[in-house]
Structures are given as structure tokens and as C-alpha cells.
Regions:
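Glycine-rich flavin
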Residues: 2-6, 22-29, 34-167, 200-204, ...
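N-terminal Rossmann-fold NAD(P) dinucleotide-binding loop
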Residues: 17, 180-181
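Short hydrophobic core segments
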Residues: 9-11, 115, 130-140, 173-174, ...
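Beta1/beta-strand and adjacent pyrophosphate-binding region of the FAD-binding site
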Residues: 2-14, 167-177
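Flexible, glycine-rich terminal cap/loop adjacent to redox cofactors
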Residues: 9-37, 42, 49, 53-60, ...
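Gly/Ala-rich phosphate-binding loop of Rossmann-like dinucleotide-binding domains
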Residues: 21, 25, 184, 188-189
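FAD-site-proximal beta/loop scaffold in flavoenzymes
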Residues: 152-168, 250-328
Length: 456
């Protein structure tokens, strides 16, 4: 049975919740975490980590198939799908076990059950009421169907898509954002016939237009049938198939994945009991220190505004705890949070797109460079990758960075760091980069923005 009171109680043990709990323990707070389902939350168990485990398999398979381009002769690789799923489970177990170990190491009590608010400073779990000076709600988000349909049968969400019982022959994905594009890219390379639908006019519609174009070409090269500006309608599911129409044309697939967004998971929190207010869009209202309208109650992650990203939730958890401890904190500049999409080709980005910068009235300067312009692009066999820097002309401000291609999800961090340290694209252009590396493409994009591109 849990103790009657704690300094800090965190509801939810995902990347936001468990990081908040560990930081609270580091600051000397008596801390407990309430988790109803699995340690590590959805990210570690059914979303981010399982997705990347399967995507890594698809990456390895692609490398084997392309080995002949590098002078290595191999036959057509054989896919062992049960082994892929077994490795996926091993990865999950390793990482969730690591989180449980960190709880133990830091003296954090894990309480299994459904946590909710009873009043300001009081939570309920398993019929017990527990007092806490600080409560942090970090319950994440849940899948959301598209209008006119519901989940069930052969209509599934992104979480189920990464744990299918068998490798499907056919699959349709509705929504070509980050999650949908990752699912489509993974299964297409594993041999599935994939249909990808997007209601807007391009894939990855939140990314810069130039990046979306490169990604769409890459997805089509993998055999994916991409349909933009298209709605899926008349969805019907049977025991073994899902039928639907697009533009009046009938289709039939083994699975239909809805990847069009998620909703905050607040149903069991009893927020009214503590006076926690929701915004019109259903998100919890918070200030820059993650404080809700209820004294001593904080909210983080997918429950609040900003991008629904694990690393953003983790940082918010630290901010909430440090504010509760009386330390100085600074609100997150959400536009500068890096985004990483692990479809092939990879995408890494932050900040404003070119269109957004122009709409906001900046005197915009753009620097672009394809990977093929630097030696490492040819060495790695990726000459079509692209680095794009969006800047402000007068002061050299770095407004946004957008990369598509090999290691884009790693390369973007350089531009994020330059921005955080108040540097601009002239600094990117002048910093010496190792040779031959893909990071030289970032440097050259900085030079292009600054008006003195060397390799181009």
C-alpha cells in the first residue's frame, strides 16, 4: 500500500512522466509515479520505440538489397517476421526495464493503478487517497478515428500497426504525417503493397515544401501508391479484409491504419475535482512553467499545447519539477523543438519553413544544398538528400533548418544547437566541419544562405 503523502506524484510514466519523477527525486523530493498500464508509457511500449525497432529492420533490409551497388553480391534476403517481432519485444523489454531500474535507483515508488484527481493536492488510486504538494499529470494521448468511422476489426491505429500478427500483403494508411509516412515506408520495404492517403496536398504537410517533395519521391520509389488531396470514405471491415473507396474507386486491403492525429488522454483524470481547466481544443491550459489553473497541479506532454513529441514532454517534465522546487525556469520555444521523422528518406527539422517565415514578414534568405555536392553524399550513396536553411537577411538569424536524407534526424541537432546558443547561419558557414562528412552539407547550406557557397 502506498504512503499517505508525497512531495511529488506523477500520473503517467511515459517520457514526460518518468523524467519528471527522476528529476524530482534528484532534487530531494519524496516521489511516486502512478501508472495504469505499463512502465515507460505508450512511447516505449507501443509507439516510438517499437516503431523505430521495425523501421531499423526495414533499413537493414534495404542495405542488404542495395549491397550490390557497393560490390557485395548477395541473394534476395528472407524475411523472418516472427523474429522481427521478437526483436521488437526484446528492445521494449530492455528499455522499460531500464526505466524501472531508474525508479528503484532514485527511490521512486511505482504505484500500479488508474490515477485521478480528488481535489487540489489530492489524488486517488485503487480506492486510496494520497496527498501531494505537487501533482504532475502526464498521461499522454489516445488514438482518434476519422469522422464516420471507428476503430475495430481491420481498422486500427498506429500503435497496433507496429505489432501486426503477420506481415500483411496489403495495407492502407490514412494520414501522411510523420507516423503515417513511417508506417508506409517500413511495410513497403518489407514487401507489403501500401496505399498512403493524405487529405492535404502533400505528404508531411507540416514540413517545408521542398522537404515534402523529396520524401514523396522517395516513398514512390519504394512502391508506395501515394494519394494526396484525397479522402477515404465508406469504410467497411470484415474478419479478414477492409473495404473503402477513394474518389469513388473501391479498394480492399488487409489492414487500414488511421494515422490522422491523437487526442489528450484526460478521461480518467477527474480534472474538474481539482479545478483544472481545458482549452477549447481539449488540451489542458498551462503557462510557461507548465502550471495549470489549479495550484500545485502541472500538466505536460501530449496533454498540453506544442508538438506531440516525446523529447518535448521530457523537457516539460523537468520545467514543471524545477518550478515546483522554486528554481528558475524558462518556457520552451516550441517552434525550435526539433522534429525527427524516420521514414526513408529521414527528415529532421526545426523552426520556420520558408513559407511561414515569409508569412511572418521576415526578410527571408534561403540556403540549400543537395548531399551530392559534398564527398560524403556520394560515399554513402545518397546524392539526393537536401539541407535547407531559412534565415533572416539583415542580422543573419537562423529561423529554421530542414534536412531530408541519410542521418537527417541526427544532423538537424547542429542547427538546433546553433539557434539555442544565439548563433546564426553565418556561424554555421564559418564553423569548421570534419571531412568527408554529411555535416559538410549543413555547413555549405549555411554558406549558401550567407552568399558564398563553395560546392555549388
Amino acid at each position: 500500500m502506498p504512503d499517505a503523502s508525497y512531495d511529488t506524484i506523477v500520473i503517467g510514466s511515459g517520457p514526460g512522466g518518468y523524467v519528471a519523477a527522476i528529476r524530482a527525486a534528484q532534487l530531494g523530493m519524496k516521489t511516486a509515479v502512478i501508472e495504469r498500464e505499463f512502465v515507460g508509457g505508450r512511447c516505449l511500449n507501443v509507439a516510438c520505440i517499437p516503431a523505430k525497432a521495425v523501421l531499423r529492420v526495414a533499413d537493414v533490409l534495404t542495405e542488404v538489397r542495395e549491397a550490390g551497388d557497393f560490390g557485395i553480391k548477395v541473394g534476395e534476403p528472407e524475411i523472418d517476421y516472427p523474429a522481427i517481432m521478437a526483436r521488437r519485444e526484446k528492445v521494449i523489454k530492455t528499455l522499460t526495464g531500464g526505466v524501472a531500474g531508474l525508479f528503484k535507483k532514485n527511490g521512486i515508488e511505482l504505484i500500479e493503478g488508474d490515477g485521478g484527481l480528488a481535489a487540489p493536492g489530492t489524488v486517488t488510486v485503487n480506492g486510496n487517497q494520497i496527498e501531494a504538494k505537487t501533482i504532475i499529470i502526464a498521461t499522454g494521448s489516445v488514438k482518434r478515428p476519422i469522422p464516420g468511422t471507428q476503430f475495430g476489426g481491420r481498422v486500427i491505429g498506429t500503435e497496433e500497426a507496429w505489432a501486426l500478427p503477420e506481415l500483411p500483403k496489403t495495407l492502407a494508411v490514412v494520414g501522411a504525417g510523420a507516423s503515417g509516412s513511417e508506417i508506409a515506408s517500413a511495410y513497403a520495404r518489407l514487401g507489403t503493397d501500401v496505399l498512403l492517403y493524405e487529405a492535404l496536398d502533400r505528404v508531411l504537410p507540416s514540413e517545408d515544401v521542398d522537404i515534402s517533395k523529396v520524401v514523396e519521391r522517395g516513398l514512390k520509389r519504394q512502391g508506395i501508391q501515394v494519394h494526396t488531396s484525397t479522402f477515404v470514405e465508406n469504410i467497411e471491415t470484415s474478419e479478414s479484409m477492409c473495404r473503402f473507396t477513394h474518389a469513388g474507386e473501391p479498394r480492399e486491403v488487409e489492414w487500414l491504419v488511421i494515422a490522422t492525429g491523437r487526442a489528450p488522454d484526460v478521461a480518467a483524470l477527474n480534472l474538474d475535482a481539482a479545478g483544472v481547466k481545458l482549452a477549447d481544443n481539449g488540451l489542458v491550459e498551462v503557462d510557461g512553467a507548465m502550471r495549470t489553473s489549479a495550484t500545485g497541479v502541472y500538466a505536460i506532454g501530449d496533454l498540453v499545447h506544442g508538438p506531440a513529441l516525446a523529447h518535448k514532454a521530457s523537457d516539460e517534465g523537468v520545467i514543471a519539477v524545477e518550478d515546483a522546487a522554486g528554481l528558475e525556469t524558462h518556457p520552451i520555444e516550441y517552434v525550435d523543438v526539433p522534429r525527427a521523422t524516420f521514414c526513408t528518406p529521414n527528415v529532421g527539422s526545426f523552426g520556420l519553413t520558408e513559407i511561414q517565415a515569409n508569412e511572418q514578414g521576415y526578410d527571408v534568405v534561403v540556403g540549400k544544398l543537395q548531399y551530392g555536392a559534398v564527398g560524403a553524399g556520394t560515399v554513402y550513396g545518397d546524392r539526393t538528400g537536401l539541407v535547407k536553411i531559412v534565415g533572416e537577411k539583415q542580422y543573419g538569424e537562423l529561423l529554421g533548418g530542414h534536412i531530408v536524407g541519410t542521418k537527417a534526424t541526427e544532423l538537424i541537432q547542429e542547427l538546433v544547437n546553433v539557434r539555442a546558443l544565439e548563433g546564426g547561419y553565418p556561424e554555421v558557414a564559418r564553423i569548421i566541419h570534419g571531412h568527408p562528412t554529411l555535416s559538410e552539407a549543413v555547413m555549405e547550406a549555411g554558406r549558401a544562405a550567407d552568399g558564398w557557397l563553395i560546392h555549388g
